[in-house]
UniProtKB/Swiss-Prot annotation:
Annotated function: May be involved in vacuolar sorting and osmoregulation.
Location (main, coarse): membrane
EC number per UniProt: 3.4.-.-
Protein name, entry field: Vacuolar membrane protease
Superkingdom field: Eukaryota
Organism of this sequence: Ajellomyces capsulatus (strain H143)
Length: 920
């Protein structure tokens, strides 16, 4: 007996063990590499590539991040001088080679501009809820121009309003200022040292650029993107047509040249829809100047962004190489391109003629390949598939009906001649899919709501615990309900109906996504096209399987000819008339005892046709159990699984593997990477005042999208994996509800500001953050002990609170070891106000000590203003930002705050002194 069963064993049959093992292997084989790609940075090469020196780049990064260097600091000036020195040391061999033999053209010409002449007055609305402000800024940018072999040889840069001839150049940008609370390793130290290595690379023999390359070391990005704004006043801003920033397909395709591409259009659409509140220089280069480009940036961990952990200890040479290699690959593609895509007429007025461009779709595949195509292509393919796929399913259904093999939606078959009805039970399993999917999807959403109410910030440090909880809950519940439905109402059509429902649902989602892509230019739902394509093919296979079934008429005649009418069999069904004539009195009184011999529907009792004794053993009707058992075993030998419809024995037993491979891999690769990308970039946004429910809801939605390919097969799973996942769910649920959400590795970010009122000499320190953790942090600060801490929610940070107390006096006036904490107006600021007689105008002269940043606030809005000697650009109208020991209050907060607290800046400066004035 055992050997007979072994011979019949099929390793890919649609039976519990093959389904459980193969499905598990497929999911693990795809999910594990996706996790590795998202969590592990590609290793740097052991030997330096030609034109690159990684050891030198790492030393440069360590020097650059040796201290905080915001724009308004002396350390910033030191960094500026150091950069000039490094640039000159790199290009010195190039200059010397040019002096030896200017005719050889072995090395390109390099020009360095220390731009301390450009200035600009403009307005900036800031980010989020910040008010509109007028800004005056003086440039300290460093600009390096590497002449391309095809560039205009004339010295147009020295002429007033000079413009180059020929094709536009390429701009690569990074800012060398940091925030006042961070060392700036990833924001943007790695970018700066990458520019230095790009300079070395393109001045190495054999790497000469065909197009001109402009390397912009801009200063002042952290406050209103000032460095990028003032670059618009330099002649080289008219020369460049492209830069590094994700926007359109023509530029993005060059990013595919890199060895380890990583990214998705989802991030760009997040900025476009306002979901991400921060901004980069992209809004200036593209939105104002009209350049087209690509952005390379770090997205995680956000808890270290703009804090003192943004240093070389918390990054690596591998991360440096990842950005540097991507920069080299993309830039090399741009400077070598000879087409005219970036030299046509621009869409906007007063912008660089960089061509119109087109919206694009892009995503990486396992960090090794990069797909790029136009949004219009996505729209066209989506529309075609939305029409063709339903048409193919419809035509296949018609052919099945014509050949009398359409068992789907068929409740019974009439016998020719007699008119008797033979039950087919083809409608069984139709409605279970949407019901179970709705319930299984509701559970993660309920869990999201539960976490938001009980422990809303657990995702800050434990995103994979949240993922595990939702995945395990979804799979276990779907398995339990599907197995229960299959036990009471087994159906060979469960898989076909499941894929049909998935087909319908993804068709609707693709329609919505196609409309958004066409009307709003949103491409983040690109994965739905591939999701729907996989669902369509899997569904079509289920319909094609039906051609292997006997004709319904043949099955009906065979059924009535094999056995007398009785109630003994659950598998072979007699007509209703025969049932009534052969039924015993006891069964005639109870219609439910007739089992499945009447026409069933999805609303019929789940216990029909399968009566149990008090010991829960199944019994049969008149005719005896022996007859039923012999008949069932005979049918099962032919291929019918347990108590499924007897006509299903001819269905192929291997096609489920093909369906799994058509749907699951593409979903896991595209949706899985999006899910991890989304949570990595958003899991810590709670500290910025964003509701974490959005993150949990996204996890719930992506959990459903990732698990749906399992559902048509999940009723065949053995109990082992679902039971294990149930235990995982219990453990992760308890952890997520009770665990402390922050840790030294995943700190809660708070925002510091100290305000000095020169009128009354008061000094107020404020921290903005999440309650109740903010109060706990403040209670650990000595100077706040015993004080009346005032808190309010009137902040530009959304859901955060701002708490204030009287803090230690700052020492921002002193230089070196000199201390000067006296709050006297004349020591901090001098000013003179002259009002124009007879006009609503005034002249204000102001000078602050030991600072080059100044802010004027008015009680009423100012119609217009002008800074003496400032340039004005009609593209940016003027109406419509120190080290330890200087600010003792900040040092105190850093010293005594819990280890799970991080400090970041709350405003343009860390200390803001105010003095009231009156214009008379």
């Amino acid at each position: 007996m055992a050997s007979s069963r072994a011979q019949r064993f099929n390793p890919i049959a649609f039976t519990p063990w093959p389904v459980t093992c193969i499905t598990t292997i497929v999911y693990l084989a795809l999910l594990i590499p996706i996790l590795v790609i998202n969590l592990v940075v590609p290793s740097a090469p052991e030997t330096n590539p030609k034109g690159v020196n990684l050891t030198e780049a790492w030393r440069d990064l360590q020097h650059l991040t040796g201290g905080f260097h915001p724009y308004n600091s002396r350390r910033n000036d030191e960094v500026h001088e150091w950069l000039l020195s490094r640039i000159n040391s790199i290009i010195r061999p190039t200059v010397e080679a040019g002096q030896r033999s200017s005719a050889t053209d072995n090395l390109p010409e390099v020009f360095v501009f220390d731009d301390n002449r450009s200035n600009l007055t403009y307005s900036n609305g800031g980010v989020g809820k910040t008010s509109i402000v007028g800004v005056y800024f003086e440039s300290t940018n460093i600009i390096v121009y590497i002449r391309g072999s095809e560039d205009d040889s004339e010295n147009w840069r020295e002429r007033s309003n000079g413009k180059p001839k020929g094709k536009g150049g390429v701009l690569v940008n990074a800012h060398y200022d940091s925030v006042s609370t961070g060392y700036g390793a990833t924001d943007d130290g790695i970018g700066v040292v990458s520019l230095l290595q790009l300079l070395r690379y393109f001045t190495t023999p054999g790497n000469n650029p065909r197009k001109g390359l402009v390397l912009l070391f801009n200063n002042g990005e952290e406050d209103y993107l000032n460095g990028a704004h003032v670059f618009s006043q330099h002649p080289l801003s008219n020369f460049t047509h492209t830069f590094l920033n994700l926007e359109d397909t023509e530029v993005t395709r060059f990013y595919g040249n890199t060895k380890h591409p990583f990214g998705s259009v989802l991030a760009a659409d997040g900025f476009k829809m306002g979901l991400l509140r921060s901004q980069t220089d992209y809004v200036v280069f593209n939105g104002i100047l009209g350049l087209r480009g690509l952005d390379l940036a770090f997205i995680a961990p956000r808890s270290r962004y703009h804090t003192d952990q943004d240093d070389t200890r918390h990054t690596s040479i591998d991360s440096l190489w990842h950005m540097l290699s991507a920069s080299i690959g993309t830039t090399e593609g741009l400077v070598s391109y000879t087409g005219m895509d970036f030299d046509g007429k621009s869409k906007g007025q007063n912008k660089v003629n960089s061509g119109a461009g087109s919206l694009g779709v892009w995503f990486d595949m396992f960090g090794t390949a990069f797909a790029v195509f136009r949004l219009h292509t996505l729209f066209a393919i989506s529309v075609a598939l939305l029409v063709i796929a339903p048409l193919v399913i419809f035509i296949t259904s018609v052919i099945l009906s014509k050949t009398d093999r359409m068992y789907l939606f068929s409740m019974s078959k009439s016998l020719e001649g007699t008119g008797d009805q033979v039950s087919l039970r083809g409608l069984r399993g139709f409605s279970r899919t949407p019901i179970i999917l709705v319930i299984a999807t509701t559970i993660p959403i309920c869990l999201a709501y539960l976490l938001e109410k009980v422990n809303p910030y657990i995702v800050h440090s434990s995103q994979f615990s949240v993922w595990s909880m939702m995945f395990s809950a979804w799979i276990f519940l779907a398995w339990f309900l599907a197995c229960a439905a299959d036990f009471f109402r087994p159906s060979a059509l469960h898989r076909a109906y499941s894929y049909t429902w998935i087909f319908v649902a993804t068709w609707i989602m693709l329609v919505i996504n196609t409309v958004y892509a066409n009307q709003k230019g949103i491409a983040a739902g690109y994965f739905l096209l591939f999701y729907f394509a996989g669902a369509f093919l899997a569904t079509w296979i289920s319909y094609l399987e039906l051609f292997a079934l006997p004709r319904k008429g043949d099955f009906a005649r065979q059924t009535t000819g094999r056995r007398p009418s009785s109630l003994s069999s659950r598998l072979l069904t007699s007509s209703a008339d025969e049932l009534r004539s052969n039924a015993s009195p006891s069964t005639a009184e109870f219609p439910g005892a007739a089992g499945e011999d009447t026409d069933p529907t999805e609303s019929t009792s789940l216990l029909r046709g399968q009566r149990t004794t008090f010991a829960n053993y199944r019994t049969s009707g008149p005719g005896g159990a022996a007859e039923e058992t012999d008949e069932r075993e005979d049918i099962n030998k032919g291929g019918t699984f347990e108590h499924e419809q007897s006509w299903s024995w001819t269905l192929p037993r291997w096609t489920w593997v093909l369906q799994l491979l058509l749907l699951a891999p593409i979903v896991l690769i595209l949706v899985g990477q999006l899910a991890l990308f989304l949570t990595a970039s958003m899991c810590q946004v709670g500290s910025d005042g964003v509701s974490t429910f959005v993150v949990y809801l996204a996890c719930a939605v992506f959990t459903t999208l990732l698990c749906i390919p399992l559902f048509p097969l999940i009723h065949r799973f053995t109990y082992h994996i679902p039971t294990f996942l149930f235990l995982v769910f219990i453990g992760t649920l308890i952890y997520n509800l009770v665990a402390f959400p922050f840790s030294p590795a995943n700190r809660l970010k708070t925002f510091f500001i100290q305000e000095v009122d020169l009128d009354n000499g008061s000094s107020t320190v404020s921290l903005t953050g999440i309650q109740p953790y903010l109060t706990e942090a403040i209670n650990s600060i000595p100077s706040a002990a015993g004080q009346n801490i005032t808190c309010d929610k009137t902040t530009p940070f959304g859901m955060l609170e701002r708490c204030s107390w009287s803090g230690l006096s700052p020492n921002v006036l002193g230089q070196g070891r000199e201390r000067d904490t006296e709050i006297v107006p004349d020591k901090w600021i001098t000013y003179n106000i002259t009002k124009t007689v007879g006009k609503n105008k005034a002249r204000i002269e102001i000078s602050g000590r030991n600072t080059r940043a100044c802010k004027l606030k008015f009680d009423r809005a100012v119609a217009n203003f002008q800074v003496s000697g400032s340039a004005v650009d009609h593209r940016m109208p003027p109406t419509s930002r120190q080290g330890p020991g200087v600010i003792p209050a900040l040092d105190e907060v850093r010293l005594y705050a819990p280890s799970w607290i991080a400090i970041s800046k709350a405003a343009d400066g860390l200390v803001e002194a105010s003095h009231s004035f009156t214009i008379q």
